[in-house]
Amino acid sequence: MSLYMLVSTFAVAFIITVIGVPLFIPFLVKLKFGQSIRDEGPKMHEKKSGTPTMGAVVFITAMLISFLIFSFISGEVSAATWLLFIALALFGALGFLDDYIKVVQKRNLGLTSKQKFLGQVAISILFYLVYHLNGFAETLNIPFTNIEVDLGWFFVIFILFWLVGFSNAVNLTDGLDGLVSGLSVIAFSAFGVIAFYQEQMDVAIFCFAIVGGMLGFLLFNKNPAKIFMGDTGSLALGGSIAAISILVHQEWLLLLIGIIFVIETASVILQVFYFKATGGKRIFRMTPIHHHFELGGWSEWRVVLTFWGIGLIGAIISVCVVIF
């Protein structure tokens, strides 16, 4: 019965997305909701200008419909259900506002950094309050041990760092056709298996709803992309995967399951630090690091496949660590 629920959750999200995206693309084109390409980006990306964006509206809707339907059918509605709903829906809403400013007001950077950060912090605080009021453990596991450390009120700082950090990390990674879509299929599949193994069906249902939606979206987002997810999708996915890692108490494994997100973010931080420290020198040709490989002559598809492969290895190792 449990496996049936997971397969059904996956299938419904996948089908709704596959049907919805082709219907949504002409609507976005009619409204002229096309992606603007930043001037400092790689020149080979200029051809992507005008590609419909905000496609995440479809797959987030599909995910939420499937997730809520099968959560209620299976009787697995819990506090974790609503925490995951908060992460996906509210981070998605923040991303939608950012995308709307970009495409309607033609401001390629969307919300200011301060506005986006304050929004992320507000959502993270709400997540913590619901988490705390429902009596979830405010502890962190020490990797490769059975020891848990009670953080007390410091746990709220961890929540802020984790949710804000990973929502931004996925957002930074979303720069190549299909990259984040494919990595999300891999990462959420891994957490879905872990949640199922730990008998957390509420979380597992959520994970496989996302896998279904993302696999359906990938059909249209792979190179050459017919549609982009926008910040609507990347912020929602980043916030959600951070929330899942907390709910299954495998926070540190997210660093391995989401290793590409970590590497992409680290490349930006290193580049900025080195640039300022050396008065203008660079470590990489361009960051996030996927652009470094592009400018080194790699095709976009080669970069994506390589990064998917690294993400898959990290996910497999993580699942094995938990199960074996």
From Swiss-Prot:
Which branch of life, at top level?
Answer: Bacteria
Any one biological process term the GO annotation gives = regulation of cell shape
Q: Report keywords, A-Z.
A: Cell cycle, Cell division, Cell membrane, Cell shape, Cell wall biogenesis/degradation, Magnesium, Membrane, Metal-binding, Peptidoglycan synthesis, Transferase, Transmembrane, Transmembrane helix
**Topology of the protein relative to the lipid bilayer:** Multi-pass membrane protein
Where in the cell does this protein reside?
Cell membrane
Give the chief site where it resides.
Answer: membrane
Q: Which reaction does it catalyse?
A: UDP-N-acetyl-alpha-D-muramoyl-L-alanyl-gamma-D-glutamyl-meso-2,6-diaminopimeloyl-D-alanyl-D-alanine + di-trans,octa-cis-undecaprenyl phosphate = di-trans,octa-cis-undecaprenyl diphospho-N-acetyl-alpha-D-muramoyl-L-alanyl-D-glutamyl-meso-2,6-diaminopimeloyl-D-alanyl-D-alanine + UMP
- Which residue ranges run through the membrane? 9-29, 53-73, 77-97, 117-137, 147-167, 176-196, 201-221, 227-247, 253-273, 304-324
Q: Which PROSITE patterns match?
A: MRAY_2 (PS01348)
Its EC number(s): 2.7.8.13
Q: Name one GO cellular component term.
A: plasma membrane
Tell me which cofactor or cofactors this protein depends on: Mg(2+)
GO MF: metal ion binding; phospho-N-acetylmuramoyl-pentapeptide-transferase activity; UDP-N-acetylmuramoyl-L-alanyl-D-glutamyl-meso-2,6-diaminopimelyl-D-alanyl-D-alanine:undecaprenyl-phosphate transferase activity
| InterPro entries associated with the record | Glycosyl_transferase_4, PNAcMuramoyl-5peptid_Trfase, PNAcMuramoyl-5peptid_Trfase_CS
Give yes or no: UniProt keyword Transmembrane helix: yes
**Pathway recorded for this protein:** Cell wall biogenesis; peptidoglycan biosynthesis
Q: Name the enzyme group at the top EC level.
A: transferase
For this chain, the family text in UniProt reads: Belongs to the glycosyltransferase 4 family. MraY subfamily.
Its biological purpose is as follows: Catalyzes the initial step of the lipid cycle reactions in the biosynthesis of the cell wall peptidoglycan: transfers peptidoglycan precursor phospho-MurNAc-pentapeptide from UDP-MurNAc-pentapeptide onto the lipid carrier undecaprenyl phosphate, yielding undecaprenyl-pyrophosphoryl-MurNAc-pentapeptide, known as lipid I.
Would you tell me the protein name for this molecule?
A: Phospho-N-acetylmuramoyl-pentapeptide-transferase
- Give the source species: Listeria monocytogenes serotype 4b (strain CLIP80459)
